[in-house]
């Protein structure tokens, strides 16, 4: 059972109320940077294991 469209709208509305319109772009930017860093870290982590197997 996943999130329906109405659940997503409710979550977005709560986020909008908590952070306000002025702070929301900064919060989303920080979130995107964090996700990108996480993905890059996961990518780097996998390549280290491949190098260890070849030795």
Curated annotation (Swiss-Prot):
Biological process, per Gene Ontology: protein transport by the Tat complex
Keywords associated with the record: Cell inner membrane, Cell membrane, Membrane, Protein transport, Translocation, Transmembrane, Transmembrane helix, Transport
KW Metal-binding (keyword) present: no
Record's subcellular location: Cell inner membrane
Short name of one Pfam family: TatA_B_E
Signal peptide: none
InterPro entries the UniProt entry points to: TatA/B/E (IPR003369), TatA/E (IPR006312)
Residue stretches spanning the membrane: 1-21
Membrane topology of the entry: Single-pass membrane protein
A single GO molecular function term of this UniProt record: protein transmembrane transporter activity
Chief place of localization: membrane
GO CC aspect terms: TAT protein transport complex
Family membership noted in the UniProt record: Belongs to the TatA/E family.
Summary of subunit composition and partner proteins: The Tat system comprises two distinct complexes: a TatABC complex, containing multiple copies of TatA, TatB and TatC subunits, and a separate TatA complex, containing only TatA subunits. Substrates initially bind to the TatABC complex, which probably triggers association of the separate TatA complex to form the active translocon.
Its job: Part of the twin-arginine translocation (Tat) system that transports large folded proteins containing a characteristic twin-arginine motif in their signal peptide across membranes. TatA could form the protein-conducting channel of the Tat system.
Protein name in the entry: Sec-independent protein translocase protein TatA
Organism: Rickettsia peacockii (strain Rustic)
């Amino acid at each position: 059972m996943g999130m329906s469209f109405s659940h997503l709208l409710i979550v977005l509305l709560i986020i909008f109320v908590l952070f306000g319109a002025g702070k929301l772009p900064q919060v989303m930017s920080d979130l995107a940077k964090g996700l990108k860093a996480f993905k890059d870290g996961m990518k780097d982590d996998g390549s280290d294991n491949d190098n260890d197997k070849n030795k």
